[in-house]
């Protein structure tokens, strides 16, 4: 009997030690990412950054940032690299997680822009005019205040899209709040409202097409969609495949970890 108790006690100690060792993954900066299990959203800047900059990484790519966060909560991975505002939305809903910032990310912000098929000068010019008019006329500031309010209370504007005879298709990945996400049965967000204004200015009816982020550029190239509004960062690799509008927002990458 005593021998059984000793064995059980020893086993409990081993399991307790194992549990403690798992909980002691310390990540406080970029420097701590080497050799860790990192989750990212497939096709994003975060994925490319991890591939290029983190040594001995065990990289897992997910359809959405939330999918990566769920694996983080379940201890299948050690951290998630994601854009700041979507990361904040995830952490607000998951109090056991927190955000780590790093000066490397803060000092190298990325710019979001709308993408069109290479050579689609007419649509690109129309989009650029809308962005310029929004900034000059105050509509852009109103949109920022609606979806990124200081008090955190988002106000979704009424649908602004025109009912034209011609349809323009916006491709997005509706898992990137506050830029694009699902609210009830509708896809809403900063980019979606901006897309509505773009369509209205062009006298066209907007159709929003939701798909995986890494499917957006192939869909644009094939003509399945007409433009991408999905918190897409401008970089040299993407410039080879699409034409970008004037930029409309700056963001940075952050690290999500368990508390």
Annotate each language-model stretch with its function.
Residues 23-28, 42-45, 60-74, 85, ...:
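Short helix-initiation/N-cap motifs at beta->coil->alpha
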Residues 36-39, 55, 73-82, 86, ...:
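Alpha-to-beta junction loops
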């Amino acid at each position: 009997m005593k021998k059984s108790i000793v064995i059980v006690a020893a086993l409990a100690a081993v399991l307790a030690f194992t549990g403690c060792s798992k909980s002691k993954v310390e990540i406080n900066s970029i420097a701590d990412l080497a050799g860790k299990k990192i989750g990212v959203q497939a096709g994003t800047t975060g994925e490319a950054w991890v591939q290029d900059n983190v040594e001995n990484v065990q990289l897992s790519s997910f359809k959405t940032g939330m999918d990566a966060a769920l694996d983080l909560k379940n201890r299948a991975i050690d951290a998630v690299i994601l854009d700041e505002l979507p990361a904040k939305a995830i952490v607000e809903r998951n109090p056991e997680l927190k955000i780590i910032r790093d000066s490397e990310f803060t000092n190298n912000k990325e710019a979001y822009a709308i993408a069109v098929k290479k050579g689609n000068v007419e649509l690109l010019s129309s989009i650029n005019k809308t962005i310029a008019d929004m900034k000059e006329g105050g509509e852009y500031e109103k949109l920022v205040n609606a979806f990124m309010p200081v008090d955190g209370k988002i106000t979704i504007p009424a649908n602004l899209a025109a009912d034209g005879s011609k349809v323009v298709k916006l491709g997005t990945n509706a898992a990137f709040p506050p830029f694009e996400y699902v609210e009830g049965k509708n896809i809403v967000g900063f980019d979606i409202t901006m897309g509505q204004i773009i369509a209205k200015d062009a006298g066209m009816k907007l159709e929003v097409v939701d798909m995986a982020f890494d499917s957006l550029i192939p869909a644009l190239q094939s003509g399945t969609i007409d433009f991408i509004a999905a918190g897409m960062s401008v970089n040299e690799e993407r410039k080879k495949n699409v034409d970008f509008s004037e930029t409309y927002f700056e963001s940075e990458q952050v690290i999500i970890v368990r508390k």
